Amino acid sequence: MLLYRDELAAWNERDDIRVHITVDAADDPEWRYNVGFVPTITQETAPSAKEAYAIVCGPPIMIKFTLPILSELGFPPERIIMSLEMRMKCGIGMCGRCNIGQEFVCKDGPVFTLEQLNKTPREY
């Protein structure tokens, strides 16, 4: 299931936005977008970092392997944006499961830049 289908289609029509929709494996024979791992697709498409932001949303392992590629492509840490909601459990800062150093993903995020993440303890 693809969420925000209309919004993604509208972005894809713009000249100033490049959208790469990707799944690991396509179960639908009519799937017309990228198939493969996001780090691989990122290397293959080699998006320009000039005046651009990279927005990364997915499982932690995908984020982990995509961030270094974006850095190699020249994206500065303040323009790499990621969603870390998979770390949340209670959603109100009580359980402590989502804390990264002094930050709580549920209260201070879940969207962070790589610049912000680089200031947290390395255990994440």
Where are these regions (language model features)?
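Charge-dense, low-complexity polyampholytic segments
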Residues: P110-Q116
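Short Fe-S-cluster ligation motifs
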Residues: G96, Q116-Y124
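Generic secondary-structure boundary signal with a strong preference for alpha-helix termini
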Residues: L70, E103-V105, P121
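FNR/FR-type flavoprotein reductase catalytic core
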Residues: M1-K89
